[in-house]
A protein has these predicted regions:
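Outer-membrane beta-barrel proteins
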Residues: 65-67, 197, 248-250, 415-417
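Short beta-strands and strand-coil junctions in structured, solvent-facing domains, enriched
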Residues: 42-47, 109-111, 225-230, 289-291, ...
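Amphipathic hydrophobic-ligand
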Residues: 14-38, 50-53, 116-130, 161-173, ...
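Elongated, acidic membrane-bridging lipid-handling scaffolds
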Residues: 1-4, 42-44, 49, 53, ...
Length: 449
């Protein structure tokens, strides 16, 4: 047992780190009240130079990363060489084997010295690392290879504050097995720290997405961890997401940030710095609610994709894969506004300079008034009567231009127009226009579209 271990930078270093006068990126403060080695065979360690430990325990430890002002120049020291798991230098040993490393009631924090605030922290970090060892390289004394083939990691119930302080991240369980090549995340929850989302919107300078995310289970299968560590290439066979509930709110009473332009999915992939290849992403039994708040309307515009299922194939930023000419595809099925079935297919060519993507879809029959939660706040139109028979649509788009066509079959349409920024007489006139000029049915009496 080792009690009350404390490692901390001195005040002079912290002062320089805060002012950006040091060549280091960060400082580390480490407090370990209890550090325990169990099952250590001292006789074997002395006679054979081999260390076998059944368990290492870190209890009530706190690791704090101290972030200062970005230094003008970062000097790379000889002892800052990149970590290579195939060639680890340790003099005087013939091998190390560790059964389990357990972290119990630990804390991890990132602290901003410049702004004097906590950026990231957690409540009670608990996890285990199992089954890994160091083996001496043959013919190369004092150099070892870290064997991770049977490594297992399990983290239970944890909560983190996300940088910025606007969100908390929770999960019930994270499990990783090197041998099975799987990573599982259960009970993931990302929620705002505000009870009222509009209170968070008041802090924002521009209109931006405010999220609430809950996921029952994420399973990542058949990935090359060694390739990720050594070469920074992320190759994954499949990602399965089950029970995703995604709520997005945008307060459109705030101005747009005209300096920021969101990228299309195919653009984002091609411009990724790290090579990524995912063969398949599947989303099952999920729910998406998108809302926009407008001036003058009490209720936000609401669009819902219920019972959402989606399949994404060939998501890659690897240049060799892109050069094959194969496209990323997205197939989506859901119940729009929780009622009529909606099917949409996307094709995202990756080997294209224009970044044009293509889509086509179909919406089944519904009562027109089922769309009022979207149409009334967005365009001031409330459907009184009418039956939608179907909508078919297709098109293409890129960052510069979009084009397409839509055919909408309906009957018995009757609507009211209520524009909040117009006078009552204008609204009466607009209602007359809507119900007189607009066709009540399509096809009409002449049976033409």
């Amino acid at each position: 047992n080792l009690k009350d271990l404390l490692i901390e930078p001195d005040t002079a270093f912290i002062k320089k780190l805060k002012a950006g006068e040091t060549d280091k990126k960060m400082g580390i403060e480490l407090s370990i009240p209890t550090f325990r080695l169990a099952g250590l065979n001292l006789y074997k360690a002395i006679t054979d130079n081999k260390i076998n430990i059944s368990k290492i325990l870190f209890k009530d430890a706190t690791c704090k990363l101290l972030m200062g002002k970005k230094p003008k120049k970062i000097v790379k020291h000889n002892d800052d060489k990149e970590f290579n798991i195939d060639s680890i230098y340790m003099k005087g040993l013939d091998g190390i084997s560790i059964g389990k490393i357990e972290f119990l009631r630990n804390k991890f924090e990132i602290y901003d010295l410049v702004n004097d605030q906590l950026i990231v922290n957690n409540k009670d970090l608990k996890f285990e690392l199992k089954d890994f060892f160091l083996e001496e390289l043959k013919g190369n004394n004092d150099y070892f290879r870290l064997h991770l083939e049977n490594l297992k990691l399990e983290l239970l119930k944890e909560e983190f504050m996300v940088p910025g302080g606007n969100y908390n991240l929770n999960f019930e369980r994270i499990y990783f097995s090197m041998a099975d090549s799987i990573l599982e995340i259960d009970g993931l929850l990302l929620k705002t720290t505000y009870n009222d989302k509009y209170e968070l919107a008041k802090k924002l300078k521009f209109t931006s997405e405010i999220y609430d995310i809950a996921v029952e289970k994420i399973k990542i299968s058949a990935f090359d961890l060694e390739g990720m560590i050594k070469n920074g290439i992320y190759i994954i066979d499949s990602v399965a997401v089950k029970g995703l509930h995604l709520d997005i709110l945008m307060d459109k009473r705030l101005p747009f940030n005209t300096d920021k332009r969101p990228k299309l999915p195919n653009q984002s992939l091609k411009q990724m710095r790290s090579p990524l290849y995912i063969s398949k992403i599947s989303i099952e039994d999920s729910h998406l609610k998108y809302q926009e708040k407008y001036e003058g309307y009490e209720e936000p515009m609401t669009a819902i994709l219920a019972d959402l299922n989606a399949q994404i194939h060939f998501a890659t930023s690897v240049k060799d894969s892109i050069s094959t000419g194969k496209s990323m595809t997205v197939n989506l099925q859901s119940n729009f506004m929780e009622k009529p079935p909606l099917h949409v297919n996307f094709i995202f060519p990756l080997d294209s300079r224009a970044d044009t993507f293509y889509f086509e879809g179909h919406l089944a029959s519904a009562k027109m008034n089922e769309f009022n939660k979207a149409s009334e706040p967005a365009i001031g139109v409330k459907f009184i009567k009418g039956d939608l028979k179907e909508i078919k649509f297709s098109g293409s788009a890129n960052p510069e231009i979009s084009k397409g066509s839509m055919t909408m079959l309906y009957s018995g349409l009757e609507a009211e127009v209520d524009k909040k920024n117009t006078e009552k007489d204008k609204n009466i006139f607009l209602c007359w226009v809507a119900n007189t000029v607009v066709h009540a049915s399509n096809p009409g009496k002449n049976n033409k579209l």
